[in-house]
Design a protein with these regions (language model features):
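Short, well-ordered beta-to-alpha junction loops that form the rim of enzyme active sites
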Residues: 6-7, 63-67, 91, 131, ...
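Short glycine/proline- and acidic residue-enriched helix-loop micro-motifs
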Residues: 28-36, 117-136
Length: 243
């Protein structure tokens, strides 16, 4: 199973700029599910697709219904000689941020100071903003999705195109990470899930009583460094298309 975060979106760019300039919000004029890819994001997806097509043959593709994920999936699949069945899957959509959607850290502190205090008290993992989700909420739906895969996709290769929080949630569930272990990954800038980064698992029959999926790569960036969205991802980027 290969899990890929969507390519760079217009909101990713606006969010980064807003944090640097101290703005309160970014991209609230467009619904989160309607945010498209940037031109650079399209190139990231195309390059990642070329890499994947040389190494994997997928039987099924599951994609978040958010536009940026759907665009990423279609662009990545272009180089594949065999086009697998593609399914839009609500359970791997972006984490819902509720009233905090589109706000920077400064924006949350300025507009909802009590919510910021509650988040500090409850911690990032368990905090649920009004109208939004916590990490455990996301884990519940991803756990349900994994149950569907176990039932319907046994002995198949699967590609999942989703979002950074969902990628980390897959790791939490598949590797049985604790809250502390997950947040340590989330806090480390060197482990920040890059746009179009690949995380993949392979079934290991020797693991556990009846075998389980074993992590083979986390956050692999397989496109040229000049297409990377951040300095951290630029350091990870390498070109290895296998031509």
């Amino acid at each position: 199973m290969a899990i890929v975060r969507h390519a760079e979106s217009e909101r990713n760019v606006r969010r980064l700029a807003a944090h640097k300039t101290g703005e309160l919000e970014y991209g609230r004029d467009v619904r989160d599910m309607d945010v498209p890819l940037t031109t650079r994001g399209e190139k990231q997806a195309e390059a990642t697709g070329r890499y994947l097509s040389k190494r994997f043959k997928f039987d099924r593709v599951f994609v978040s219904p958010y536009l940026r994920a759907v665009q990423t999936a279609h662009l990545m699949l272009r180089p594949f000689a065999h086009h697998p069945r593609l399914t839009h899957e609500e359970r791997i959509r972006e984490k819902e941020f509720g009233i905090l959607d589109g706000l920077t850290r400064h924006g949350i502190i300025n507009k909802y100071p009590n919510e910021w205090k509650r988040r500090e008290r409850e911690g990032k993992y368990y905090y649920r903003p009004p109208g939004g989700e916590s990490y455990p909420d996301v884990a519940l739906r991803v756990h349900s999705f994994l149950g569907t895969l176990a039932r319907d996709c046994r002995k198949q290769s699967v590609l999942v195109v989703c979002h950074s929080v969902v990628v980390l949630t897959f790791r939490r569930l598949l590797e049985r990470l604790s809250e502390k272990e997950l947040l340590a990954i989330d806090r480390d800038p060197e482990l920040d899930v890059c746009n179009c980064a690949i995380t993949w698992y392979e079934f290991d029959p020797g693991a556990g009583e009846s075998g389980r999926l074993a992590l083979r790569e986390f956050n692999g960036v397989h496109y040229p460094a000049d297409l990377a969205s951040t300095d951290e991802c630029r350091r990870k980027a390498h070109v290895d298309f296998g031509f």
